[in-house]
Structure formats: structure tokens, C-alpha cells
């Protein structure tokens, strides 16, 4: 997996080459960048600000792939993988991002698992390394797991009586029935309560691969 993230890093660094100032009236140019390992990316250069933004997505790794009885798995992983990674616990990892003005977030949709990274160009090496750690060496410490679980459970309880959430659940269930799209990405109170670190690690091994 580290080889995969070296390839991703190579693509990301391409976005920071040739720093300068582009004419304001210049049309946006989208470039296709392919790493030596086959990672395909689409690059838009804008040199007006010293920032690098990168969005990634793993297709076929969304909530619709959650195993029966473990609904909400992808969603919970999206809330956990930036809560400590490698040698850094949650507080240390978060402090490193905050001190360097690095923004890192993840989301699990029905079809894919996505992430977004924004950093000052001078902090790009640290930012890419934090992204690599989050995706390849998340810790899933007990404190973070229970804190994120409590947040999800609170949201599920609120959604039980929220008209918009009720309408959404009813719509997807009526349209898709027993198909995985008919399930709610956040899972249920029962399934979320049963998720554990082994489930999260299994998801990471399965989902975060170049083939996705």
C-alpha cells in the first residue's frame, strides 16, 4: 500500500510545479496526469494562491458495499481514519494538521469513499504524509472509536424523528427495496453498536487499493 501512496504523492506534487501567476482571463485547462504506477488524475493549475488541493475517490468502496449486519461501516471509517494514524494518536494527529493549516476530510457515499486535502504548498510533503498515514495506518484507538460512535448514534436518534430524514429513508426504500441502495449509509443503531476495530481494519484492506 505504501507503494500506492508514493504514486499518489507523485501525482499530487505535479500540482505544485511551476509556481507563478497566470493571467486572470486565461481559460481553465484540465490536464490528465498518470503516474508510473498507473494512478490517473486530473490536474487544474491555478497559481494565484500558494495552495494545493487534492480530491481522491475509491470507487466500489461506498456504503452500498457494507456487509449485511455491519451497515454504517464505511461511514464510521470515514469519521475515524483521521483520528490518529501511525505513531500519532488522535490529539497529536489533529494538532499536526491544525498547526500546519492542513485540512483533511473523508466521506462515504453510496458508491465510493472519497477524501479531500487542502494545504499550503510549503506544507505539501507533511500533508501528503498525513494523508498516506490516514489511509494506510489508521489506529482505531478505543477512545476515538467510542467518541465517533457516540456522534453517529446521536445523529441516528435525531434522524428518527426528522421529517427530511424520514422522507429520504422512505424514498430510497420504496425505490430500491432490498437493493443496497435502499439502505441508509449511516447504518442503524443496532449495526453501529456492533462495529469494532477488526471491522474497520478489514474495510481499509479491502477498500483502499489502486483497483478501486
Located regions from the model:
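Charge-rich, well-structured scaffold segments of protease-associated domains
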Residues: 2-4, 13, 34, 42, ...
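His/Glu-rich zincin catalytic helix
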Residues: 20-96, 114-121, 125, 129-132, ...
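Residue-level micro-sites within transmembrane alpha helices that shape
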Residues: 5-6, 74
